[in-house]
Amino acid sequence: MHVIPYCHQRGDKIMAYNYQGYWKDVGTLSAYWEANMELIDIIPEFNLYEEFWRIYTKTDVIPPQYFSADSKVNACIVGDGTEVYGEISNSVIGAGVVIEEGAVVTNSIIMNNTVIKKGAKIEKSIIAESVEAVSY
């Protein structure tokens, strides 16, 4: 259930603010996936690199991304500390992720500290934080 209808049903006080900026309801997995894929559009509605959209967070000090000479990357956002040896395309990749040689990630969201093992094929998926995705 979405937050506002839930609060209304409980009888909670609901107030409004006429916000003019970017907002997207990501209350379902499909909406969350779509919002992330929109970030890698050629001209995204919400451009993370525009100066007025700056988001300041506490970050860990980790090395930059590493892309092996044999890796293939197309239209992705890749977090710091990520190592790419395989192929990634049209995906949002968190920090500290390892994409092993022979692994292929397409149209997906991979959360922090996850390992995509050799030979794994990930397509249109959301992979949780700190897990291993294996080929079978």
Model-derived features with residue positions:
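Left-handed beta-helix
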Residues: 1-136
